[in-house]
Amino acid sequence: MEERKPLVSVIVPVYNVYPYLRDCVQSVQAQSYQNWELLLVDDGSTDGSGELCDELAVEDGRIRVFHKPNGGQSDARNVGLQQTQGKYFYLLDSDDLIRSTAFDQFVERCEADGADAALTPLKMFSTEQPEGRTENPHQIPELLNREETMSRMLLHQGIGHGAGGVFFRREVWGDLQFPVGILYEDYAVMYRAIARCAKVEVFPEPMYDYRIHTGSTMKSGITEKNLVILDVGEDVTRFIAETVPVLKAEAEYLQLVTYLKTLKGILDGDFASYPEAQARICRFVQEHRALARRPWAKRADRIKVETLLINKRLFYAVYGLGEWKNKHTVEK
């Protein structure tokens, strides 16, 4: 008798995504791997998404629904983590899609190699660009250890630190929870999660389709809430320096790049905005400018650092030119 394949728990936080939710669920139902459960965590939706969750559960017995007051994506993910029954779990956002062979490939490789997690690049798409583009592409499948995986994440070499699309062995994830009430929760938790892994499967092809919305956290301007990323970056650097000290420089480099991006966002609004945050960023860049000359640092980041050390207006102009070139390269 053939041994039953391990159960995969799919966690989907749901909040006011009625137009996209059925497509998301259907991408799970289309999996060639059939031993899964789908946990829809309705986070206090007001657009009918919660009712749609219930309808979908009636249609498919593998779907379980949990309704809760609105507490944010992190809170909803944490509820899902508490309810998982599978050996593995997968994080999927309710407006995104998963490729049909993903679970087959993830389970096969993790079971064969004893890996604790599987990561893939994202394909990012929108209504305006349905063909999308691949974020952090790389060439070949690899089995990496903890340090190699974290290094690739820190340097954005083929994988990032987003939690959407992460496939994880449940017992290895353990008691980790996403921080509730702040932005950039993925940045805050994913390095802690990977630090618990002995081996990680990294796939070259995207198996997660990430939908970009105008006004999303990734694309909207800087507000007071966004400035928490300065603390998150500092906290992650501290954690890595203590846990995997060989990667301290790479962690500081990610913090440097994150701070530069945040400064650009502040200046997009007003050069006089958030003076304390600007001073904090400039101080960090001044103290860590040598990182931009490391062999793994990107030339574009070195130029941003050097121009900022001259003056903010030059930095802003150069950064904006780089964004314009990247945008038009993608569109071509």
Where do the protein language model's features map onto the residues?
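Cell-envelope/extracellular polymer assembly enzymes that use nucleotide-activated donors
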Residues: 6-9, 37, 188
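Short, well-formed alpha-helical segments that are part of the catalytic scaffolds
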Residues: 16-30
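A conserved acidic beta->alpha catalytic loop
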Residues: 34, 42-52, 69
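Glycine-rich, basic loop-to-helix element that forms the pyrophosphate-binding segment
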Residues: 68-84, 97, 105
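Donor-binding/catalytic cores of nucleotide-activated saccharide
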Residues: 73, 94-200, 215-224
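Short aromatic/hydrophobic "clamp" motif used to bind/position activated sugar donors
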Residues: 89
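Catalytic core of nucleotide-sugar-dependent glycosyltransferases
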Residues: 207-213, 220-247, 261-291
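Membrane-interface aromatic/basic loop that binds lipid-linked glycans or pyrophosphate carriers
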Residues: 271-332
